[in-house]
């Protein structure tokens, strides 16, 4: 769920080293009849559509520097293991056969994983409320030099509120829809996130996961967007480089507050959510400032909120972004391949997984969003038993993040992504900095 943009490839310990190109698993260059969302609109103006020019007809406003490395094959286990090591993965899955459907995969899941348990659902709420309250207590009592740790805990804890609202939106929290709407709205309020607008857009992410142009989460940067102007190019490079772990803020602003982005049947519910968010801001923020001042507002609300957006950006990037995971145009898109092959399971430190209610156990969630968060691990185990050879597995590590942030950038049919510094090396100082500054080891 971050703005439509790219990610990155990686594997540099110095400026002369180059990561092996991603294999051509199932990618596709856009045809002249496809429209795309402009990344700059996500950052500044809102969604507009622009006609994609075929790559061969693009104006050569930047000098491309191509590294003549033959793309490796991923047809056998040894090659996939090599790619996994290069990208920071534990496993890169085999291609799912074209004749396998999403229903085929779903039918192998135990029926119990779809069952809603009210006790477990409200236990999740208790965990989030308690951990968030503990975080606020730590912020209040911590000396200045321990505040970053308190903010990290509290930002992670409040991310749990988002996951609870996420379950409500997918009808996997309660059998009572009114309860889900109320809990979802309240859970999103500390994040000043409008529940219904997010729910409508997120449903489209699930319906069109990794579909070029149409997925409402992360997208590769369209080549013609990157070529359009030097100023825009620098903004894109910086936005998808150093500040990328907070770029979900741009997605939050762009997608959820403009009534024109919603269908007429959705507008009334969107207005209710917006009214709740604005009421929280109008009452909650002045109250915080009255009690602890503007610096207190920064200390108790803004910093944990930025911590939440770090996780929002990181989780959503890692879920669907890797050099070997393609985005496809609608006429080539396959639902089962997108949801199983195109989703990543990533293990994080246990305390993060607990506070965030296993949002990282993401493959079963894309097989069926109706699986409650507390049943995701059982569903994942079933998927590993029946479809494990097709899954992408990782443990959160520096190499994985370095790959995403320094390589998965501009859309390309053959390679899936082309890094910024291969297209505009003289303007890619932020990417060069990340390659030098980010450690290159995998846990």
Swiss-Prot record:
Arranged from A to Z, the UniProt key words for this protein are: Chloroplast, Fatty acid biosynthesis, Fatty acid metabolism, Lipid biosynthesis, Lipid metabolism, Membrane, Oxidoreductase, Plastid, Transit peptide
Q: Which pathway is recorded for this entry?
A: Lipid metabolism; polyunsaturated fatty acid biosynthesis
GO-annotated biological processes: unsaturated fatty acid biosynthetic process
From the Swiss-Prot or TrEMBL record, what is one GO molecular function term? acyl-lipid (n+3)-(Z)-desaturase (ferredoxin) activity
Q: How does it sit in the membrane?
A: Peripheral membrane protein
UniProt motif (Histidine box-2) ranges: 202-206
Transit peptide span, please give it.
1-64
Reaction(s) catalysed by this chain, per the record, are: a (9Z)-octadecenoyl-containing glycerolipid + 2 reduced [2Fe-2S]-[ferredoxin] + O2 + 2 H(+) = a (9Z,12Z)-octadecadienoyl-containing glycerolipid + 2 oxidized [2Fe-2S]-[ferredoxin] + 2 H2O
Disulphide connectivity of cysteines? none
Record's Pfam families?
A: FA_desaturase
Give the E.C. number(s).
Answer: 1.14.19.23
Q: Name one GO cellular component term.
A: chloroplast membrane
Provide the function of this protein.
Answer: Chloroplast omega-6 fatty acid desaturase introduces the second double bond in the biosynthesis of 16:3 and 18:3 fatty acids, important constituents of plant membranes. It is thought to use ferredoxin as an electron donor and to act on fatty acids esterified to galactolipids, sulfolipids and phosphatidylglycerol.
Family named by the database record: Belongs to the fatty acid desaturase type 1 family.
Instruction: State what protein this is by name.
Output: Omega-6 fatty acid desaturase, chloroplastic
Q: Which organism is it from?
A: Brassica napus (Rape)
